[in-house]
């Protein structure tokens, strides 16, 4: 399970270090795609297969389902770690997530998220203020 928050610097080539705690579970090759809230979602191959099966079950006759599937898969890229544990993020994904130099890599259970430091801070400030309210809404799912 992925958990924790790690700050890293992206180099000029668009490479970022994957935290050592995440490397083995992600595997040598993994999928990076557009996430929600302008972050990137990173899935190990086995988890990607699970997501892929669920998405394939969406009705293609539903306009929202078609839009989601198109954007989710069109933005996806298979990436791999180099020997130093870095991953080169494709330019279109860096642009989508507004990644510049300072990035935050967050473990979120079955996936990893990559955020720009600025967007992560903004997100946390807003979500932290509503944390208890969000928890109350989620209590049925948690228990």
Curated annotation (Swiss-Prot):
Under the heading PROSITE patterns, the entry gives: SPOVT_ABRB
State the species of origin. Carboxydothermus hydrogenoformans (strain ATCC BAA-161 / DSM 6008 / Z-2901)
Q: How does it assemble?
A: Forms oligomers.
Q: Which GO terms describe its cellular component?
A: cytoplasm; nucleoid
The keyword tRNA processing appears for this protein: no
Q: Which residues does UniProt assign to the signal peptide? A: none
Give the InterPro entries listed for this entry: MraZ, MraZ_C, MraZ_dom, MraZ_N, MraZ_sf, SpoVT-AbrB_dom, SpoVT-AbrB_sf
Q: What is the protein's name according to its record?
A: Transcriptional regulator MraZ
Q: Which UniProt keywords apply?
A: Cytoplasm, DNA-binding, Repeat, Transcription, Transcription regulation
Q: Which locations, inside or outside the cell, does it occupy?
A: Cytoplasm, Nucleoid
């Amino acid at each position: 399970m992925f958990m924790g928050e790690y700050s890293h610097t992206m180099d000029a080539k668009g490479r970022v270090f994957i935290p050592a705690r995440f490397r083995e579970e992600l595997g040598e090759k993994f999928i990076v795609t557009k996430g929600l809230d302008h972050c990137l979602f990173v899935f190990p191959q086995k988890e990607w297969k699970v997501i892929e099966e669920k998405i394939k079950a969406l009705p293609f006759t539903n306009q929202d389902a078609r839009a989601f599937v198109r954007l989710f898969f069109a933005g996806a890229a298979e990436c791999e770690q180099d020997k130093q544990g870095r991953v080169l993020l494709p330019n279109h994904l860096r642009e989508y997530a507004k990644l510049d130099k300072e990035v935050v890599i967050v473990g979120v259970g079955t996936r990893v998220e990559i955020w720009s430091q600025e967007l992560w801070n903004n997100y946390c400030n807003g979500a932290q203020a509503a944390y208890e309210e969000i928890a109350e809404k989620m209590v049925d799912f948690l228990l």
